[in-house]
Each structure stands twice: as structure tokens, then as C-alpha cells.
């Protein structure tokens, strides 16, 4: 006679283990999620306190001192744009930006177009009875404070407006309107704009970032009415950079530096182009097809400096003002990087100068698309 005993079969045991594992894993995930939420909540609380403290500090300063280094406002002294605060072993980055704003309550400033006025003069339209043009468009300052953790995650953000304690008077300053587009005419958002003028007091060296419309507006700049002293540079990751230049006699720049009169504005549009690192391969041969080694190749092109069709000056020129011509290797090959997309010319305007092997000048017989098998292909 066989005696039966209570217990679990192997199948029942396996099912039980699976169920228990699921419950344990779910509990662990829940615990981890709750722990993560608690940590995030604590850090957001710390970040909020840091942002509030920074904002209160900025608001306690005299109005004329509300400007950050590398920012959009000209001043004689500057606040640091970023600070690192360590709380309970965690590093937080506190970033402050300060810009001017034009508000329609006392009229709008001088804008290049009605569309820009409606878009960038806050609270447009102006109330009845306000002046047709606000001669001091820098009505107040907008302070923006953000706090991020080391991963770059934004944990807190605050904004406020700060106005001067004295009555607004007509200014002895001007404004620059800068638009950045790509080569298809589309606005480039996030481009860095730097504006300098070493002939004003104080010197101007301010920067800002284009908005979604590719626009930067810089208010309250000191006037500079002659010799085109305001130099403007536009740059962006993955794009070419472009800097304005001054007229040369009767030659007018394609992208001109600016004069700026008091109580007026200047407007400039800059075109930057998407580009890659590897730009051009030159394969140099003689008329028999034999490679020319040690040949220095003169190349110019890209952005045209001046508008006159008779002038052939370009931003990229590897012989002037300094000689940086590439030299071909034993296979007659040379590579050039970081060229702006556009037209390029070889061996001078007529193909007769500055392509040399030693003291021997070689004339350009033909420039044809690269047909070799070198892995560094042109783009």
C-alpha cells in the first residue's frame, strides 16, 4: 500500500517561483521608480532655491550693472553668465541671461519693417497718444535664470522684467537688427551672433543667439557713425561662419560692417551654409596625365567679398594675405578641408599664376571633376 503525502509538483513549484519573481521584480521596479522620483523632486527643490536666490541677487543690483559677460548688453562691468553650485555633493549649473526689451507702452523703436515691429515690439500695437517712434527702445531688461544638473537636464527656470528707477529719456544709442539665413533663404535658429566695436567707449563685445526666425536684436549700442566700425560675426555648429567687412574705396561689401546713428537702427542679413569637414581633393597632373608632386596649388572662392562683378576678391584665398597653398603628394594629390560651399578658382583668375613646382609656374589647362578612387571623396 502506497502512502500519499501533501506537497507540490515540479510544475506547481516552477509556476510559484515565476509568480514570486514577477512580484519581487515589480516591487523592485516600483521601489526604484519611487526612489528616482524622490531624488528628482529633491534636486528640483534645490534647483528652484538656487534659481530664486540668483534672481533675487540680480534684482538687488543697480540697473546699469545688469549685464552678463558675453551677453547682449554693453556695460562697464559684467556678471558671470554661469555659476557652479555644489549642494549635498551634487553640482548644479546656474545660468543667467539678460536682454533688453522694447515695449509698445511708450511707442515702438525704429524697425527696418512693419512686420518686424509687430513681431518684436512687445504688447503691440502702441496705445493711443504714444509717440510714433520710441527714441529709447530699450524699455526694460528681461532676466532669465536656469538651473541644470551635470547631465544638462533643466531643473528650474525663472524669468522677470527689471526696469530702471529713473524716468526714461531719449537715448544716445542705436539698435542692430541681425538676421541669419542659410543658402536656401531659410532662417537659422540657434546661430551665435558676436558684435564688436573697439572704437566706442566702452568697447562693444556682445553676443546673442538667433531665435526661431533667425533674428537677433541688440539695443542700446553706442553710436558709431563713420568707417563701419561695427563688425558682426555669425556662426553655428555644422555651418560656415561669416564676418562682415568694411568697404574698400568704391567697392561695397557683400556683407558689410555697420555704422550706427543715435536713435536709429541698422539691419544686416548674413548667409551661413551647411558644410562638412572634407571639402576638396585636388589631383594635379601634367598634360600627359603624369602626377605632379610637390605642386603648390593656388585656390580662392567661397564667399565673394564685394558686390562688383569686376572684382574677384573672395573670403577664401590661400595665397593672400598669407601663403597657405596645399602641396601635392607623390601621387599629385592634395586635400583641403573646411571650405564653404560655392565656386572656386584655381591658379588665379586666368589660371596663370601661383600654381608652382619649385620655381616653375604651371598654367591651368583644365579643371575637371575628380574621377579617382581615393577614399576622401569631394562633397
Spans of model-derived segments:
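N-terminal leader/signal peptides at the extreme start of proteins
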Residues: 1-8
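A short tyrosine-centered beta-strand micro-motif
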Residues: 225-233, 341-348
Amino acid at each position: 500500500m502506497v502512502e500519499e503525502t501533501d506537497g507540490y509538483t515540479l510544475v506547481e513549484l516552477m509556476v510559484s517561483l515565476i509568480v514570486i519573481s514577477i512580484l519581487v521584480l515589480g516591487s523592485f521596479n516600483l521601489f526604484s521608480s519611487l526612489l528616482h522620483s524622490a531624488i528628482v523632486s529633491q534636486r528640483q527643490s534645490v534647483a528652484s532655491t538656487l534659481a530664486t536666490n540668483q534672481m533675487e541677487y540680480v534684482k538687488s543690483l543697480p540697473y546699469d550693472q545688469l549685464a552678463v559677460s558675453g551677453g547682449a548688453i554693453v556695460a562697464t562691468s559684467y556678471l558671470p553668465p554661469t555659476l557652479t553650485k555644489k549642494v549635498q555633493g551634487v553640482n548644479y549649473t546656474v545660468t543667467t541671461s539678460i536682454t533688453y526689451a522694447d515695449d509698445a507702452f511708450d511707442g515702438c523703436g525704429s524697425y527696418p519693417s512693419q512686420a518686424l515691429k509687430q513681431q518684436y515690439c512687445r504688447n503691440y500695437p502702441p496705445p493711443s497718444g504714444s509717440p510714433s517712434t520710441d527714441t529709447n527702445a530699450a524699455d526694460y531688461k528681461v532676466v532669465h535664470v536656469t538651473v541644470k544638473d551635470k547631465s544638462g537636464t533643466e531643473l528650474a527656470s525663472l524669468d522677470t522684467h527689471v526696469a530702471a528707477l529713473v524716468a526714461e529719456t531719449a537715448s544716445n544709442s542705436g539698435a542692430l537688427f541681425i538676421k541669419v539665413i542659410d543658402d536656401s533663404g531659410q532662417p537659422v535658429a540657434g546661430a551665435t551672433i558676436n558684435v564688436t566695436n573697439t572704437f566706442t567707449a566702452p568697447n562693444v563685445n556682445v553676443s546673442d543667439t538667433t531665435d526661431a526666425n533667425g533674428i537677433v536684436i541688440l539695443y542700446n549700442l553706442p553710436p558709431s557713425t563713420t568707417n563701419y566700425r561695427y563688425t558682426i560675426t555669425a556662426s553655428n555648429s555644422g555651418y560656415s561662419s561669416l564676418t562682415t567687412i568694411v568697404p574698400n574705396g568704391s567697392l561695397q561689401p557683400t556683407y558689410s560692417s555697420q555704422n550706427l546713428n543715435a536713435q536709429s537702427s541698422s539691419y544686416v542679413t548674413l548667409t551661413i551654409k551647411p558644410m562638412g569637414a572634407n571639402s576638396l581633393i585636388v589631383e594635379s597632373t601634367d598634360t600627359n596625365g603624369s602626377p605632379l608632386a610637390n605642386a603648390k596649388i593656388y585656390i580662392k572662392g567661397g564667399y565673394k567679398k564685394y558686390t562688383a562683378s569686376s572684382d574677384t576678391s573672395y573670403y577664401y584665398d590661400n595665397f593672400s594675405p598669407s601663403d597657405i597653398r596645399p602641396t601635392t603628394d607623390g601621387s599629385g594629390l592634395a586635400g583641403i578641408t573646411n571650405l564653404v560651399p560655392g565656386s572656386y578658382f584655381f591658379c588665379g583668375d586666368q589660371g596663370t599664376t601661383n600654381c608652382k613646382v619649385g620655381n616653375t609656374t604651371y598654367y591651368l589647362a583644365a579643371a575637371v571633376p575628380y574621377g579617382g578612387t581615393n577614399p576622401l571623396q569631394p562633397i
